[in-house]
Amino acid sequence: MIKVMVMKIAVIGGTGDQGLGLALRFAVAGEEVIIGSRDAEKASKAASKVLEIAGRDDISVEGATNPDAAASADVVVLTVPLQAQMVTLASIRDQVRDKVLIDATVPIDSCIGGSAVRYIDLWEGSAAERAARFLREQGTRVAAAFNNISASALLEVSEPVDCDCLVASDHRDALEVAAELAEKIDGVRAIECGGLENARIIEKITPLLINLNIRNRVRNAGIRITNLPEQE
């Protein structure tokens, strides 16, 4: 089993469905969560929504601006659409110095007005690699994770999430932190996939899952990797 860590987690872009779902799952798992947004009031409303969905008052979740959330956190999870990725990273660049940042960005065509089932090839290879390149001088260790987990499944907090979480990073500590966070979500198993270049493959799975949702009229298509040894 992965060692248990207690973390203060900033979910940047946490007012969208993916970010809200991750914030919800981390909070009910006992973590201290800060939802980040460009608008502090919007972030506070999202935090209140997490409390409402959870139906509990014993969880720790609050809202803040993106820079304030990132500054206060031990680990930062980025959950913004592709078109907002770089401007958001620029706004928190100083606040993520020497921290682990987990990027859940997926480059899909719907981010620029096209199809949600079409992947956009990026010059850097993947959205996570683009983030790592941008933050390299800050000493930020970037991991790719949560790209393939359905937002609607995350928000159905009474049900386990039937999906593995594929994790990639060039830094051992970032891999471990991302895997630890993933396995705080009921039903999720973290699969360490190696270096960050593997994010190119991980990110491309998401438009396929969206296509399967559409074709089969479901919402929560996920991925499971079989016949692997138990990870210690």
UniProtKB/Swiss-Prot annotation:
By its UniProt entry, which Gene3D superfamilies does this protein fall under? NAD(P)-binding Rossmann-like Domain
The protein's matches in InterPro entries, at most eight in alphabetical order, are given as:
NAD(P)-bd_dom_sf, NpdG, P5C_Rdtase_cat_N, STEAP_metalloreductase
Supply the EC number(s): 1.5.1.40
Thermal response of activity: Optimum temperature is 60 degrees Celsius. Is extremely thermostable. No detectable activity is lost when the enzyme is incubated at 65 degrees Celsius for 4 hours.
The catalysed reaction is: reduced coenzyme F420-(gamma-L-Glu)(n) + NADP(+) = oxidized coenzyme F420-(gamma-L-Glu)(n) + NADPH + 2 H(+)
One GO-annotated biological process of the protein: NADPH regeneration
Entry binding sites for NADP(+): 15-18, 37-38, 42, 80, 106, 151
A UniProt-annotated Pfam family: F420_oxidored
**Swiss-Prot/TrEMBL keywords:** NADP, Oxidoreductase
How is activity affected by pH?
Answer: Optimum pH is 8.0.
Highest taxon above the source species: Archaea
According to the UniProt record, one GO cellular component term is: plasma membrane
A GO molecular function annotation here is: cupric reductase (NADH) activity
Coiled-coil residue windows: none
Q: Note the NCBIfam families from the entry.
A: npdG
Indicate the quaternary assembly: Homotetramer.
The UniProt function text for this chain reads: Catalyzes the reduction of NADP(+) with F420H(2) via hydride transfer, and likely the reverse reaction, i.e. the reduction of F420 with NADPH. Probably functions in the regeneration of NADPH required in biosynthetic reactions. Is specific for reduced F420 as electron donor for the reduction of NADP; neither reduced FAD nor FMN can act as electron donor. The enzyme is also specific for NADP; NAD is not utilized as substrate.
Which family is annotated? Belongs to the F420-dependent NADP reductase family.
The molecule here is called F420-dependent NADP reductase
